[in-house]
Amino acid sequence: MILYHGSNLFIEQVDLQKCRPFKDFGRGFYCTEIKEQAEQMAKRVAYIYGGSPCVTICELNEEAFVSPEMNIKTFRKYSHEWAMFVLNNRNRDFTEFNRVDCNHDNKYDIVPAQLPMMI
């Protein structure tokens, strides 16, 4: 599976410590299957933080989605569960990390959803 990441710099290796916290699916490396979406994000990030728009192309082995070693949280549609997950991840005061409806602690390796995918 080919994925795209829009930023203001080329990403050689994912480093979660460089990823911003309190995003929809938690701190992570957000990607999309839609190249144009990544291009728009790259322009936005470059406008906000400076630099030049850059789209990093990533390849994800689809076997990762069925690997028992991966902890995956899937949202098949927008729902109350999805909304609470996003709300809790955006909440800087949220501290109940053991709950399944948050990813502050990066318990989920992949969160595929209708929005950009976090890996």
Language model: regions and residue ranges:
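Ordered hydrophobic segments in well-structured contexts
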Residues: 1-5, 29-31, 54-57, 109
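Glycine-rich loop/turn
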Residues: 1-29, 36-47
